[in-house]
Amino acid sequence: FWYMLRSRAVWFFSTSNPTLTFGGFEGESKKEMYDLLPENYFPKTIYISPRQPFEQVQQNVYSGGFSYPFIVKPDVGMEGILFRKIDSEYQLETYHRRMPVEYMVQEFVDYPLEIGIFYYRHPQNASGSITALFSKKLPSISGDGFSTIKELLEKEQTGITEELFKLDEGELDSVLGRGDRINLSFIGNRYHGATFHDLSGQIDERLLNRFDTISHGSRFYYRRYDIK
């Protein structure tokens, strides 16, 4: 509160990332961030307007070199809201017709390890600090050879069971083989059932140098990074 009075600005802290709307704390466009990063630092991405005819969307997707599955999500959004994995043209058309805002089509990166890093740097300093490093474990279920996916979900009592019922009704009655495992979500946050594991013991000078380089190139001074 004192800092707000002293600076005479409610959003005084937004200057920590001057290149982003509200400093990247709320309402920023993902495109804003990606435009400041080298292309090899994020998955292949295109942006779709909700006003585009679906035929144009199809053309953009194919000319962009995408193949199913891929990810769609709003350009402005958080907490995994309206994030979807698209496996077919029908799913893409359904998503497009229901989507009221600009969204992004993004390459599906299916690596087993996802980590989060929190980094900050004062603009006057050459080097910053990494204050958190953690891995994300997505919620999953393992088959027993006779229970359906729906029965396994009910046994697990996961917080996202209802969402899965709505999205994947056709698959809920299939039986998962013994030892076979499927992810219940591809979104790495607590709301969607992910768990987090501390890796701060792995922070070293080499990792810090990498993020110093990113910070100097992008002018991101206060940021969490999600990496696969």
Tell where the protein language model's regions lie, with residue ranges.
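Alpha-helical membrane-targeting segments
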Residues: 1-18, 24
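A long amphipathic alpha-helix within ATP-dependent nucleotide-binding catalytic cores
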Residues: 153-228
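Short, compositionally biased low-complexity segments
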Residues: 5-11, 31-38, 177-189
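Short secondary-structure junctions and interdomain/linker hinges
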Residues: 5-8, 44, 68, 160, ...
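Active-site nucleotide/adenylate-binding loops and adjacent lid/helix of ATP-dependent enzymes
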Residues: 18-19, 29-164, 204-209
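A short alpha-helix capping/helix-coil boundary motif
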Residues: 10-15, 71-73, 191
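Active-site rim elements
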Residues: 20-24, 197-200
